[in-house]
Regions:
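Extracytoplasmic/secreted envelope proteins and their assembly/folding machinery
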Residues: 32, 36, 58, 62, ...
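Short acidic, glycine/serine/threonine-rich helix-capping segments at coil-helix boundaries
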Residues: 28-34, 40-84
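Second-shell loop/turn segments in exported
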Residues: 45-51, 69-72, 96-99, 137, ...
Length: 220
């Protein structure tokens, strides 16, 4: 039995047939498989290039939209598709030195940079939202401090905390860590930690040994 579904998002018609999605807008077309392959080629974190849209597909699109300064929807518009076809791999702010992690607060992305200075992985994150919150019997501000740090210690598993569960956290500034979370909106929303999607938390945990540099900055 075959099923063909169609719905409209703005000026984009999305056809879904056997988990293969074609995005069509003003003559621009790109299947889910093509989208995943192109994003993966540019370094955006795709768990598996298989033509099946999942959370990594959506988050990779959002990361691409963040990097390119576009509307963060998780769905490719016609102009997004056009840009994706010609885009280049993002460039690290700190291209020299050993392998490291960069957290770009302005664009809400994490870049994993290899020993050669080339960005190997880009994943969407959510950092401190600068709002006040009450914890440990005091008011605090949800701020992710900018600066150059190193991974200090790690917790191999899910760490229970008063503000929520931290999945495979790598602490780099006191109680601030890069950790997995089921909630990664396309904007800053954390209490100060760097949230990453659950599909990337275990891999990042292994990729970030104690002592690895973590550079947190606002992009100029």
């Amino acid at each position: 039995m075959r099923y063909k579904l169609a719905h409209y998002v703005g000026s984009i018609t999305v056809f879904s047939l056997f988990l293969v999605v074609t995005l069509t807008a003003f003559g621009q077309k790109m299947t889910t498989l093509e989208t995943e392959q192109r994003l993966s080629d540019l370094g955006y974190w795709i768990t598996k290039v298989d033509g099946k849209r999942d959370d990594s597909t959506r988050q990779a699109i959002i990361a691409f939209q963040k990097i390119e300064g576009r509307k963060r929807t998780g769905v490719l518009s016609a102009s997004d598709i056009e840009r994706l076809r010609t885009a280049t791999r993002p460039v690290a702010k700190f291209a020299s030195g050993p392998a490291h992690v960069e957290v770009d607060i302005s664009r809400q992305v994490l870049l994993y940079v290899g020993d050669d200075g080339i960005v190997q992985k880009i994943v969407s994150v959510s950092t401190g939202n600068e709002q006040k919150y009450f914890d440990d019997n005091q008011w605090q501000v949800a701020h992710t401090t900018r600066g150059n740090f190193k991974v200090q210690w790690k917790y191999n598993g899910i760490r229970k905390a008063s503000l929520g569960d931290l999945y495979y956290p790598s602490y780099f500034n006191g109680g601030i860590a890069v950790h997995g979370s089921p909630s990664i909106p396309p904007y800053a929303a954390s209490h100060g930690c760097v949230r990453v999607p659950l599909f990337a938390d275990k891999a990042l945990f292994k990729m970030m040994p104690v002592g690895m540099p973590v550079n947190v900055y606002d992009r100029q």
